[in-house]
């Protein structure tokens, strides 16, 4: 019988496996060192959302700088002078309001009452904002109500008794402001500061009633003189030169408008006196890094309100 042999296993070809291993030998391992953009993005967002330290958080970059920084804040940060003058736009509004007072004075007291009430309201609001107290609805309403009460008192008493009507209203409103501040639960220093601001706002708004008590010719000259003086003061000139130009321009306006009325050349004195008070009010509205809101309230109204007593007194004396 012929011997039988078991089949011997045949070796498998290794070339294809070796080629595949060679092709994958230098491929990077999957899942170990590949970049992870999804994980990096939240990390970057977290880093951006959490600024270093306790420093201030800044807004997004803009082409023209940070729009939230006002001129007053920039001047304070740079250590510049706290005096920032209102500029030409508030001066133009002051001139417009002054010309309205001058134009409506010849229409009678009720015609004059419309721009006067606007002046008194802006005066009360501007003084509170100038003192950094905002919102101050109660104080503004109190000062404006005092001005309206003074207007009614002058209309009821007549121009002959206008000083008593104005001073009486002012005394009542000072007492009322004191009572309201005593009822406040704020700190003593804060109450005193609020009392002074309330009394000053009411006083300035009430004093503006002097236009209602002054002769119509004096109101016409005074309103025109203040308008010209404030515009001249806002010209791009050195401070001393602009003051001189403003006073001379106001005196010239007084002569021009006085020539149309019974005051004549005496209008120069009234115009110069009104301009001096207007420039004081203009300077007050420029103090302590004022904002644009201050410029468009106190900067508009204070020159005219400050000139009202002089317009009344010189109008009575020269008329």
Residue ranges and their predicted role:
Residues 181, 185-259:
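Internal active-site segments that recognize and position negatively charged phosphoryl groups
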Residues 121-134, 175-190, 227-240, 279-292:
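C-terminal ends of transmembrane helices
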Residues 53-56, 238-319:
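C-terminal transmembrane helix-loop-helix hairpin of multi-pass membrane proteins
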Residues 79-93:
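N-terminal membrane topogenic signal
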Residues 1-72:
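Intrinsically disordered, low-complexity repeat regions that act as multivalent interaction hubs
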Residues 98, 116-126, 146-150, 173-177:
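Central hydrophobic cores of alpha-helical transmembrane segments in multi-pass inner-membrane proteins
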Residues 102-119, 159-174, 209-226, 264-276:
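Structural signature of hydrophobic alpha-helical transmembrane segments
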Residues 134-145, 165-168, 189-200, 241-250, ...:
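Cytoplasmic-side transmembrane-helix entry/capping segments in multi-pass membrane proteins
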């Amino acid at each position: 019988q012929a011997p039988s042999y078991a089949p011997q296993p045949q070796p498998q070809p290794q070339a294809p496996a070796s080629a595949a291993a060679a092709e994958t030998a230098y491929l990077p391992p999957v899942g170990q060192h590949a970049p992870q953009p999804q994980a990096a993005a939240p990390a970057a967002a977290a880093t951006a959302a959490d600024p270093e330290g306790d420093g201030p958080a800044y807004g997004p970059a803009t082409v023209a700088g940070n729009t939230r920084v006002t001129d007053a804040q920039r001047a304070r940060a740079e250590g510049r002078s706290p005096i920032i003058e209102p500029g030409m736009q508030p001066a133009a509004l002051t001139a417009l309001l002054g010309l309205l007072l001058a134009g409506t004075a010849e229409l009678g007291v009720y015609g004059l009452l419309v721009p006067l009430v606007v002046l008194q309201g802006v005066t009360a609001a501007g003084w509170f904002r100038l003192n950094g107290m905002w919102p101050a609805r109660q104080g503004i309403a109190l000062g404006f109500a005092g001005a309206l009460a003074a207007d009614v008192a002058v209309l009821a008493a007549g121009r002959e008794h206008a000083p008593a009507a104005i001073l009486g209203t002012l005394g009542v409103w000072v007492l009322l402001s004191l009572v309201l501040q005593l009822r406040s639960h704020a700190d003593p220093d804060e109450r005193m500061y609020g009392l002074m601001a309330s009394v000053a706002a009411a006083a300035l708004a009430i004093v503006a009633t002097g236009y209602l008590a002054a002769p119509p010719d004096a109101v016409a000259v005074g309103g025109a003189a203040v308008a010209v003086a404030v515009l001249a003061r806002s010209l791009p000139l050195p401070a001393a030169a602009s003051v001189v130009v403003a006073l001379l321009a106001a005196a010239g306006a007084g002569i021009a408008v006085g020539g149309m009325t019974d005051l004549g050349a005496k209008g120069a004195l009234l115009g110069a006196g009104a301009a001096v008070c207007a420039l004081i009010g203009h300077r007050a509205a420029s103090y302590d890094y004022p904002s644009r809101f201050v410029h468009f309230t106190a900067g508009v109204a204070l020159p005219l309100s400050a000139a009202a007593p002089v317009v009344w007194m010189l109008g009575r004396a020269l008329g």
